Curated annotation (Swiss-Prot):
This is Albumin. GO terms for cellular component: extracellular space. It comes from Capra hircus (Goat). Induction: Up-regulated by fat diet. Belongs to the ALB/AFP/VDB family.
Amino acid sequence: DTHKSEIAHRFNDLGRHPEYAVSVLLRHLVDEPQNLIKKHGEYGFQNALIVRXXXKAPQVSTPTLVEISRKQTALVELLKLVASTQAALA
């Protein structure tokens, strides 16, 4: 939250609404995974996460990597649902 408020404060100094600025800055964090799921499907997305995580943290067990990738995929789906709900309410 401190980082978010710091970013918002910087953009507010530029005369922009802070919440808008943060949403614009963080939009790619939602869009990129959603686009990858659309392109490769959930299975392919989870495999990509497992490969990425194994390269960064080889000491983590395969079952743990699989569980983390499943949770990340579920989170992306939840964010997609939230975004579509917000768009419907707007």
